[in-house]
């Protein structure tokens, strides 16, 4: 998890999250600017409405005042016309009664005018309060509508993101299941190979074989050692190889081959010496038959010489027979060792191939495991980021609801 690939992925995720946060903050700033502009427009419209209402109220007041002044001026004009001498003389009683009624009416309009003005003031106050409350309700309604639209957009965006994250989660889950299935298959293969190696070791132990490491192939001392290069031989062959000295298997076999050549050369030399001695003995026999008339002293010397020659010949024959036996045993051992070396080299090559395949499978499994862990970490970071964003949006929503 501390790989450079995982670090690059985490930085990419952080950059993507920071870009999303910047985009969201930019959208929020634009929404706040639009809301402020709408509020300013509503305030301006409210001021214009209030000025218009005041103007209408002034016009209404002027109209009512004018109407009341006209109503107040009419009884006085009537009284003036009735007070003209000689106009309606026959109806003096009725005119007197009318004068008293006009006096009462002249007092009643003042009271009715004050009552009307008070009622008008109350109506105006109620009207103003109703207009203000209506404007406030209109503003609150527009704010709530805007908030509802914003929340709807946010909810739709969140639903789309959640659907996308659900799809990604399903894909990642399927990929994880596939990886687990592949891991189980590879684990089964690994168990089978381990069982095969165990059977091989049991076979080697059962037949009394010995594993000889072959660290430097082809007898190259300066060559780097090959990991896992081994050779399996019998115990007798192992003793023979130990007698050849230390070193790689090729070097030991080369030493045995050189010793074999030396022994063959010694045997040839001994055969030549034996032929020479046989020729000498034949010559001595011929000389002994020719010199039968020699003296007894010379005969004794010849007999001694012949005995020595026969003894040497017998010794050489024994050495030659022993060397031939050693040569045959060495040849048999070399042939057997060569066959075993061929077999064990093939077995070692197969084991190396199996081991290389196992190492490759192990490396591939480790890479897949690291990839799966990186993906899981990325998904956890994405999930945590989404949870934080969802909590933030819930907090904003509760704050908006509390402000309402």
Swiss-Prot record:
Stretches assigned to coiled coil: 27-71, 110-199, 249-397
UniProt GO MF annotations: LRR domain binding
An individual GO BP term: Wnt signaling pathway
Skewed-composition ranges (Polar residues): 69-84, 282-296
Keyword Iron set for record: no
Keyword line: Coiled coil, Developmental protein, Wnt signaling pathway
Spans annotated as Disordered: 56-112, 277-296
InterPro entries: LRRFIP1/2
Basic and acidic residues compositional bias, start-end: 56-68
PANTHER family in the cross-refs: LEUCINE RICH REPEAT IN FLII INTERACTING PROTEIN, LEUCINE-RICH REPEAT FLIGHTLESS-INTERACTING PROTEIN 2
Family: Belongs to the LRRFIP family.
Chain's role: May function as an activator of the canonical Wnt signaling pathway upstream of ctnnb1/beta-catenin. May be required for dorsal axis formation.
Protein name, entry field: Leucine-rich repeat flightless-interacting protein 2
Lineage of origin: Eukaryota, Metazoa, Chordata, Craniata, Vertebrata
Gene name tied to this protein: lrrfip2
